[in-house]
Amino acid sequence: MDPKHKRVADFVRELNRRDGRGPGDFPIAVSRVEPRRGNLERFVLPSQQETSSSVPKHAEPAAEHTPTITPEAAETFAKTLDNQQLSADDIVRLESIILPALRPVFDIQNETYAQLPGDWDLLNHQRAALEPILRAVGRLQLTGHPSYTLVGTAFVCGPNTIVTNRHVAQIFVQGLESGQQLTYLPGVSCAMDTLAEVGSDASVKLDLTRPVSVSDTWDVAILQVDALPPNIQPLPLAGSAPASLQGGLATIIGYPSYDPNESFVDQANVFRAVFDKKRLQPGRLNGRVDVPSFGRTVSAIAHDCSTLGGNSGSVLISVETAQVVGIHFSGTTHLSNYAVPSWELVNDAALAGRDITFN
């Protein structure tokens, strides 16, 4: 088998091991046709077509669900988990049908999300705790930059403090390597839009007045915001590792953008070819792993939420506790994604004096 195809198949098997599933299971099944109507059960996935209509608070799932998971796709799924030989067609089904179901992406609209299917039901139960977090996450937007307008995700973590990735800040901040005072590039300004939702042109932009600091160890940068709207509160950071660090339900909240270096099939199917809009991207935590970061090796959180480049700086939430446990910064397709552990920042000089709460 082609090495890339093997990695896709191995990734699907690993996701299902983490989810505790077997060949007879398929996630996010919201309806089933009785087996007597065919040799294989058929599964239906909820439709998430982009629409300009608003989603009411605590919206119920759409009445119609598309697309149907075909018997061929279900058979591919079973073959994968049984470690059977896969054909080229099987690999296409894994990438275009099964992976979007295993680690889906959900729209955030009107600062909430629709009722989610059973595999993600804990997100429904934690809605009241998660909605304030949604409001504190935004899309970084530049004015006056010669090459970039949208550059990543950030979130509010202190009364006047925005956190994102250092590699994001490198695009529009000077002085990072020299040790001099940090400033925006000449003629460039930065704002954070805390809406930018699917199907809406509404925005709530916070002017970020200056870059403050970057971490020497972690892919973290701090920006200044002078005022917050009343409905946006700073997010406390977890001051210790969650009990669910290995296998716990998690979600990224951020703004995935199109990545020309990634599979178009994956992006079209998992993200529905909708980019740079606020999304809920659930998955599971997978412990700690050593990865390179700015000339060092760091022990990052591993997670398997579906992400793209615009997710740099996204908040990583433990769904069980509704706490910020990490800041997403990189990943390897069909292998793992990585986040800065929030508790490792307790004594980081970049955050000193910023009135950040660690729980």
Predicted regions and their residues:
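Protease-domain processing segments flanking chymotrypsin-fold serine proteases, especially trypsin-like
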Residues: 1-152, 279-284, 288-289
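C-terminal subregion of chymotrypsin/trypsin-like serine protease catalytic domains
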Residues: 2-25, 293-301, 308, 312, ...
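Extended hydrophobic/Leu-rich segments
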Residues: 94, 204-206, 358
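Serine endopeptidase catalytic core focused on the charge-relay Asp
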Residues: 117, 129-144, 148-151, 155-309, ...
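Active-site-adjacent segment of 2-oxoglutarate/Fe(II) JmjC oxygenases
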Residues: 125, 191-198, 348-359
